[in-house]
Regions:
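Extracellular, repeat-based ectodomains that mediate carbohydrate processing or recognition
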Residues: 1-122
Length: 122
């Protein structure tokens, strides 16, 4: 089986959908290669989406959107477009993962290429 050029359909992806504290999150790329993060309240809330300010650099099936939540501060962490390239990472403001605050891109910081002082993949 080949995944050449396909994104959003990867059998190995483990954190493209995430459930945490009464909310469900999903991440994917649009046909124009922008990263999207969506959320809904459980059990049956409607999905709300936001577009992050990052476009996929290459249509490679290994470039998945990975989501995580920090239980310490309620931040949502998003890593994307990281196959054989530098890291592209963004996190939300504290508490967004556990609150009903508005779901808008301005609740996330700028896309960066490091974690702390460590540049990854440059």
């Amino acid at each position: 089986m080949s995944y050449d050029g396909l994104v959003n359909v990867d059998s190995f992806q483990q954190s493209g959908v995430l459930t945490y504290s009464g909310w469900q999150y999903a991440g994917w790329y649009t046909s124009s290669k922008y990263a999207i993060v969506a959320r809904r309240s459980l059990p049956s809330g409607g999905w709300k989406t936001l577009q992050l300010p990052h476009q996929l650099s290459v249509s490679d099936s290994h470039n998945v959107v990975a989501l995580g939540v920090s239980p310490v501060d309620g931040k949502i962490h998003v890593a994307m477009d990281c196959h054989s390239t530098q890291l592209y990472y963004v996190s939300s403001e504290a508490g967004l993962a556990t609150s009903g605050a508005s779901w808008t891109a301005d609740r996330f910081g700028s896309v960066i290429n490091s974690l702390g002082n460590l540049a990854i993949g440059r």
